[in-house]
Amino acid sequence: MDNVPLVIASGNKGKIGEFKKLLDDFPIDLLTQPVGFEIEETGSTFMENARIKAIAVSQATGNLSLADDSGLSVEALGGAPGIYSSRYASSDKQRIEKLLAELKPFSNRKAKFECALCIASGEKVLIEVSGFCEGLITFFPKGQNGFGYDPIFEVSGLGETYAEMDHEKKKHIGHRGNAFKLLIPKLKQLLGSMKK
């Protein structure tokens, strides 16, 4: 059987790169969403936004679509930036600076990353999973790897930020890796059923 086309519902190069590494062993052809394709994220949770994106891209392309909505929730900030993580400011650097400034008056630096994944075919949702990683917000950026808030998110018990980890380590303990651990058996089952 030929590889199954699967469109990644994202224009984020960092996410696309991680998806490609995480799904490297699957009989799928990973495609990116059409250039300039914009989806309004109107959900109130990460999963609702992942669902909206997966359905929209699947309907637009006629292929299976995999969407991720993920972000950072900081306890002292009432869960902010949450679903607005990527829209918190206009660049990664500005987002980090804003978050560190808002967190300055607080001693509680607990945070968690969440990743919601959804695979859709047309308007039908086929798979939904979520993964998490608990940690703390550092006082200043540390590390050169990763993207987004990675330089200020220190994983609980490890003493390293995501940006200080190599891809393999982040894949095994990070929120996206944890979500993919749940997705992979379901994706294998889905692909197996498509062969019949």
Swiss-Prot record:
Source taxon at top rank: Bacteria
EC numbers: 3.6.1.66
Cofactor: Mg(2+)
GO molecular function (one): ITP diphosphatase activity
Protein residues bound to substrate: S10, G11, N12, K13, G14, K15, S70, F147, G148, Y149, D150, K170, H175, R176
Broad class of enzyme this protein falls into: hydrolase
Alphabetical UniProt keywords: Hydrolase, Magnesium, Metal-binding, Nucleotide metabolism, Nucleotide-binding
Gene Ontology BP annotations: nucleotide metabolic process; purine nucleoside triphosphate catabolic process
Paired cysteines (S-S): none
One Gene Ontology CC term in the entry: cytosol
Binding residue positions for Mg(2+): E40, D69
Catalytic activity: XTP + H2O = XMP + diphosphate + H(+); dITP + H2O = dIMP + diphosphate + H(+); ITP + H2O = IMP + diphosphate + H(+)
InterPro entries, A to Z: dITP/XTP_pyrophosphatase, ITPase-like_fam, RdgB/HAM1
Listed Pfam families: Ham1p_like (PF01725)
Biological function: Pyrophosphatase that catalyzes the hydrolysis of nucleoside triphosphates to their monophosphate derivatives, with a high preference for the non-canonical purine nucleotides XTP (xanthosine triphosphate), dITP (deoxyinosine triphosphate) and ITP. Seems to function as a house-cleaning enzyme that removes non-canonical purine nucleotides from the nucleotide pool, thus preventing their incorporation into DNA/RNA and avoiding chromosomal lesions.
HAMAP family: Non_canon_purine_NTPase (MF_01405)
UniProt subunit comment: Homodimer.
Family: Belongs to the HAM1 NTPase family.
Name of the protein in its database record: dITP/XTP pyrophosphatase
Origin species: Prochlorococcus marinus (strain NATL2A)
Lineage, top ranks: Bacteria, Bacillati, Cyanobacteriota, Cyanophyceae, Synechococcales
